[in-house]
């Protein structure tokens, strides 16, 4: 079993050119499926039937796994058996007839304007780390970019004079404006702080860790969780929370959906439309609480 999974992982990496995140997600799902098989249905992967996979889906549901997790796991298993069909291990895909679970649509966590101000005020601008963290958080809320885009930014992607950044995702570039407070925070960081942090003068990364190397996704996540704790905000704040809040606050203040779609880098406007539902839900909640006859 381990050999077949290793071959499939090699196929994803070399033939499909899967990203590290995609690779990790697929293999995590498949290793969990393999553990289930080992415990409840000891058999080689090519002998697995549709009934076995359906049983696994029911088992995950019984364990309280979310609909999104179950649906993703089915997709991972289906992809594995598509590969087995190509390699001649199986003649039919046993996962093909397994029904996906309907995903519940959860609205993203949104910070209020006051919560954003409180959160952005947490970094203490008294040392290099404080100035760097303040610049990162201001930039994230100013632009709504993804954390992967934030840590991929290079110094040349920022135009302080024109107040914008260039963000890139999946080979596409977009220009996103910056508000004055973000420009001010970035300017101080880039001119006064970043040069002190660099381990290598040739480093191109805009944001670096305290060792002078490009900031990692995990490193930034820890920074966000730290400031959530110091701010005393009960909502679960992730790097994506500021992206969601950016979109909703723009929408609440009159921005059109197409412009928000462009700034967020959504290929399909349906991905952006969820924010209209968030705004409507917020208005309904306000109405229910404030109207004397509600």
Question: Can you name each region flagged by the protein language model?
Answer:
Residues 1-294:
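Conserved catalytic core of the tyrosine transesterase superfamily
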